[in-house]
Amino acid sequence: MASSTPSPATSSNAGADPNTTNLRPTTYDTWCGVAHGCTRKLGLKICGFLQRTNSLEEKSRLVSAFRERQSSKNLLSCENSDQGARFRRTETDFSNLFAQDLLPAKNGEEQTAQFLLEVVDILLNYVRKTFDRSTKVLDFHHPHQLLEGMEGFNLELSDHPESLEQILVDCRDTLKYGVRTGHPRFFNQLSTGLDIIGLAGEWLTSTANTNMFTYEIAPVFVLMEQITLKKMREIVGWSNKDGDGIFSPGGAISNMYSIMAARYKYFPEVKTKGMAAVPKLVLFTSEHSHYSIKKAGAALGFGTDNVILIKCNERGKIIPADLEAKILDAKQKGYVPLYVNATAGTTVYGAFDPIQEIADICEKYNLWLHVDAAWGGGLLMSRKHRHKLSGIERANSVTWNPHKMMGVLLQCSAILVKEKGILQGCNQMCAGYLFQPDKQYDVSYDTGDKAIQCGRHVDIFKFWLMWKAKGTVGFENQINKCLELADYLYAKIKNREEFEMVFDGEPEHTNVCFWYIPQSLRGVPDSPERREKLHRVAPKIKALMMESGTTMVGYQPQGDKANFFRMVISNPAATQSDIDFLIEEIERLGQDL
């Protein structure tokens, strides 16, 4: 990690009243956020941009205007210096208003403002409750209950327009019956948390409503993506300046890109002539790797039989000797080894494959090395933990999902490629209506032809904005904290009779895998009958957990092992007290099993 990482700015008003706001430095004043902080209780409101040319007096006046909200809940204002617009929250009868009454309808500005202010209030209330530990993680209902309708919440589509009042009810109920994945006690998935800066970025992204295929229609976002991808490649450790990459719809697609790039690198004729024109190719990945590698093998015409699984040790790491043996076996049988996937942070155990040893084997047999760091890539931001990915700089490609350990809102996944031009060559189709070569700007910034998609969502802005807000050091601290919580959990349960660890030793990542042993099974010798009973414990506790809605954690089997809990921590809001609560809740729900 570069030593030039900027330090977080310090505030001379650290002890100030949190309900008041002093002016921030000029670079922050560009955003309405300078006024948003004036009231904590009503929360943030999206208010547009403030022009950089505003005088200090003008900015002070705007902040004062926002402070009025503390004494009047009806005042919600947005002032842009170029038009002086000001909106007041008014009692509005939405039962007689419809979508056709909103902009671009004539005279639709006021109705639009009132409607959006109502939506923002719904969102802010949801955000506030998400961080309130007395709020449930979920209000669980079975599918048939939601399909049948819940207290006026009807999922069926209507032929005729419904009122904006009903639309607002639908907005509230959609959040009410969903899962609060940002709740500090939600541990069910690798992607958790609700970053406020990222949320602001996603709101702005949706408002801009553009596409990432050309600089022509997304100039700022395209440049942000290039700058961010370059920074990520540098953090991986690639010294060349001509690498490549793109943001994709998720880690599974990023992994698919890596296989496509490898195939095109060694057999470019496959693009025009198909798989019939190339030898019988095989791919290698660990038995603990993400299932997306096999999915990509099926989708790209290799076939799942030609995705060869490599044995792992008891910690879930690839055994290099088995990899080399299977490469030689495939060659002897007439297959052509093409690609090896090493995982940096497996989904279940959180294991890091020995990349250096795998890279040696790939170089020896001239194979493409991909590192799936979707889950573990965030550790590259930590000087304390990045050694776990030692050798990643030797990879030909890397998958890295900022929407996991870095807490970026879904979706945000990058495929990084060491060699420039492969993605373009592999996927380029030169659609004349998008990628005209005679545009008035440098068309090398039209990145859309590198993608297998045409339309591509803007995933970069929320990530870029978070990086600006936190700095590299902020992400480092966030990731270190999550790993410290995993260590805390492991130390708390490793020697207790109610719990049994799935594998020996401290976890490498935030994955802590364990069985809860109910009273009825403690001291019972291992046997098929005991394993069968133990297999049913985690699903029963999880069902009770979801019914109560107090917390969520995942479970699964692995190989011949009975169902166990897989605790993962990626939510910066989680604390030791939340870990304590989870353990107590598992004990409470499982004590009578």
UniProtKB/Swiss-Prot annotation:
Q: Which Gene Ontology cellular component terms are annotated?
A: axon; axon terminus; cell cortex; clathrin-sculpted gamma-aminobutyric acid transport vesicle membrane; cytoplasm; GABA-ergic synapse; inhibitory synapse; mitochondrion
Residues of the region (Disordered) are 1-22
Extract the InterPro entries matched here: PyrdxlP-dep_de-COase, PyrdxlP-dep_Trfase, PyrdxlP-dep_Trfase_major, Pyridoxal-P_BS
What phenotype has been reported when the gene encoding this protein is knocked out? Answer: Deficient mice die at birth with cleft palate and apnea and exhibit reduced levels of glutamic acid decarboxylase and gamma-aminobutyric acid in the cerebral cortex.
Entry keyword Phosphoprotein? yes
Q: Which residues carry this modification: Phosphoserine?
A: 77
Q: Which family does it belong to?
A: Belongs to the group II decarboxylase family.
Could you identify this protein by its name? Glutamate decarboxylase 1
Q: Which organism is it from?
A: Mus musculus (Mouse)
